[in-house]
Amino acid sequence: WIRTFSCTDGNERSPVVAREFGLDTMVGVCLGEDHAMNEIELASGIAIARAGNAGILAVGNEVLLRGDLSEDEILDYILRAREAVPGVPVAYVDAYFLFEQYPRLVEACDVILINCYPFWESCPAEYAPAYMREMYRRAQAVANGKRVIISETGWPSRGEAYGEAVPGKENAINYFIETYLWAQKEDVDIFYFSSFDESWKTGDEGDVGAYWGLWDEHGKMKYV
């Protein structure tokens, strides 16, 4: 599996290429404050799904967390997508705790997609895997029996500390290993964030935002 975060600006090609290599894609429809752009994204996501190139259609990512749209607006996009592609699982991505607060979103989604970041909750690295597992259990408790997928989790290898959460290569690789050992044992599906470092993200998250990848921005594996 791979995951995308948009269906425009060339991102609509990624699921096609992934399919050629035998990979499924969780196709992300980017939603925000620009309603006209949302319509373009949704139409492109639906087209990708109808072409058989979406294993899951994820309509929106952390939209409530950012405060870009209301719950009712997000539900409208989700329901329109479900009507357009009835054979494809349709869902919405956000922080795990928001599914506790918005049960109508749980009802509208075919699967529950949760982002789990102990780092951004100032959790010390040694306790982070256990805290991530607790996030998952909390989402499971309100999922009404639906499949819960961790759509994002990770730990940065460099940058400034966030409270008691300290970046570093050792902390990052330990988090990765413990996360995947647990996921394999418990049969939990995870999209790890992320494949590559992204230098452009420093504007939003400070210097730590650039260093969440397993590979650096030049494609070199960081943990060898």
Enumerate the language-model features and the residues they cover.
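Conserved, mostly hydrophobic/aromatic
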Residues: 2, 57, 112, 150-152, ...
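Active-site clefts of carbohydrate-active enzymes
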Residues: 117-120, 144-172, 195-203
